[in-house]
Amino acid sequence: MTGTALTGMMIVAAGLFAAGVFGVLARRGILFQLISLEVALSGPALAFIAAGAYHGDAEGQGMFVLVLTLAAAEVAVGLALFLRIRRSKGSDDSDAVSGLKG
């Protein structure tokens, strides 16, 4: 892999991360926030793969497996919380959930 290809892959990875973070901050629905979080996690995963391919070692692939495992755990916990919130509040709006009791 050349330096130009690595630069292009890093730009795409940064774009994915930025789009995911924007989606988490801009959307109100919890399900859309979970999807945006997955997009945000795919950015660093792509960066690990590209850097590993550029340097010719397998550490990037190992980090990708770690990010993939983290994303799978995040989806499992996030969907369980989403279903619980949807049943108790009747809405998937994150503003409805964030009300403090006191």
UniProtKB/Swiss-Prot annotation:
EC number: 7.1.1.-
Catalytic activity as recorded in UniProt: a quinone + NADH + 5 H(+)(in) = a quinol + NAD(+) + 4 H(+)(out)
Localisation: Cell inner membrane
An MF annotation (GO) of this entry: quinone binding
Record flagged with keyword Protein biosynthesis: no
Keywords from the UniProt entry: Cell inner membrane, Cell membrane, Membrane, NAD, Quinone, Translocase, Transmembrane, Transmembrane helix, Transport, Ubiquinone
Keyword Nuclease: no
Transmembrane segments: 5-25, 30-50, 63-83
Gene3D superfamilies per UniProt: 1.10.287.3510
CC terms in the record's Gene Ontology section: NADH dehydrogenase complex; plasma membrane
Recorded topology in the membrane: Multi-pass membrane protein
GO terms, biological process: ATP synthesis coupled electron transport
Subunit architecture: NDH-1 is composed of 14 different subunits. Subunits NuoA, H, J, K, L, M, N constitute the membrane sector of the complex.
Similarity section: Belongs to the complex I subunit 4L family.
Its job: NDH-1 shuttles electrons from NADH, via FMN and iron-sulfur (Fe-S) centers, to quinones in the respiratory chain. The immediate electron acceptor for the enzyme in this species is believed to be ubiquinone. Couples the redox reaction to proton translocation (for every two electrons transferred, four hydrogen ions are translocated across the cytoplasmic membrane), and thus conserves the redox energy in a proton gradient.
Name of the protein described by the UniProt record: NADH-quinone oxidoreductase subunit K
Higher taxonomy: Bacteria, Pseudomonadati, Pseudomonadota, Alphaproteobacteria, Hyphomicrobiales
Recorded name of the encoding gene: nuoK
